[in-house]
Amino acid sequence: MSGLVMGTPWMLQLERPVESRPGSQLVTRSKHYPYAGGVSEYTQRSDEELIQPIILLVDREDPAGEHHGIAAAALASVQAFLRDPENPDWQDWSSAAFGKTVRRADAKMFAKVLAAFPEHALVEVGEGRAAGLPPMPAAALPKLLAKLQVSGTQLPRGEPLPPAPLTIVLNASLEMSTGKAAAQAAHALFAWVLESKPGTVEAWVADGFPLSVLELPAKEFRKGARKSAGPVIQDAGRTEIEPGSTTAYVSATKVR
């Protein structure tokens, strides 16, 4: 929790609705929700577009379990924002494509990223480790980040996470790679933070960011989505899955 700015409203003011953002993912719920989920990591971007890098540790010798890595990536995305929510880059980023890029690094490269970007938010969930950074120009990522791979990121199944008051639910029928699932999980958790009341988020932060990850088959996923605690993420379908596929949402049981 060190370094997080508490008592600060984190509702970002967006200049245009999600429908007008080319290449963005949609976020759906019973009411209109104005936050885009993000463009694909492989989509060509404009020179001005900002993207949030999330670096996932994929240790060659002892890789983390998949759910641990997914949870760490989602929390790293959110904690990077909560550390400095008044950074104007967040406003510019949220008013555009709202994109995230999950890139993998081995232990040596991961350490280099942490040293090179002191503004990172480092998260450990069980065996999983990930670092979230503030948004930066997508077309001009620092070389250290640009050379990190995106496609083919896969962690072994590993042990499941224990139940938690907040759970990211993923659509298992889509058979997403770890990298794809991590990006969708980050979209869902970030959307929950932005839509929730500040007091709800602060209570979750004060409790130590409890989070679990659950995968459900399509029928159960759709049923649970009707009672989600936040927006249901719908993918633009540029990689791995069909356009319009619903990928992730947050389920809350005890978060105030």
Language model features with spans:
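Positively charged, small/polar-rich N-terminal and surface patches that mediate targeting and assembly
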Residues: 10, 29-212, 218-227, 231-256
